[in-house]
């Protein structure tokens, strides 16, 4: 049996301000830092250890991993960064307040933008200063690989090749893997692992900074999955994520 641990980054500055973040590279809040440290302490207390970690190229996930590994005294672990683990791109909504958008367009429309499987938000213009196509961290990508908007279906399409080509073979080789990523890149992986339908994925919310453990068989099919820590606190944290897009 293999164990895989997924963790969404701790609270970011734009989580706190209830803004659509996407590929915008915002940092953790003091609360987010403490969430990441708590995750590391919890993993250590529960006897977890890792051989390799994966994360995105966005600092809120990277710093979450740093703080988590620091608490585990594992700062020396090899870490692989990939843009494919980035958050879903929220297009022209990036930087805008979710509750304000709900007041303007209605809760139902914002829920579609936030959680539907195949409906992307309005796209950024390539000339928009928020567009990441000139960002040095994506210099090795073709322009069309740097999105102007994404739905979850698009996020799945970029996450799964990385899972299949990099992460899954590492797990099959017997290495213990930790992934620190984002709400929607984790939703993409969970959808794939658990076979969640396009309709049911709308209701899945990933809380910040709480380790999600998957026990996998030899074919990397889930035997079971669970969050570490207090179940009631985890449920409250997931409910808070769900409520972010309401007026």
UniProtKB/Swiss-Prot annotation:
Pathway: Carbohydrate degradation; glycolysis; pyruvate from D-glyceraldehyde 3-phosphate: step 3/5. The active site is at 9 (tele-phosphohistidine intermediate), 87 (proton donor/acceptor). It is an enzyme of class 5 (isomerase). Substrate binds at residues 8-15, 21-22, 60, 87-90, 98, 114-115, 183-184. This is 2,3-bisphosphoglycerate-dependent phosphoglycerate mutase. Its EC number is 5.4.2.11. Pfam families: His_Phos_1. It comes from Acidovorax sp. (strain JS42). The record marks 182 as: Transition state stabilizer. GO terms for biological process: gluconeogenesis; glycolytic process. PROSITE patterns: PG_MUTASE. Keywords: Gluconeogenesis, Glycolysis, Isomerase. Catalyzes the interconversion of 2-phosphoglycerate and 3-phosphoglycerate. Homodimer.
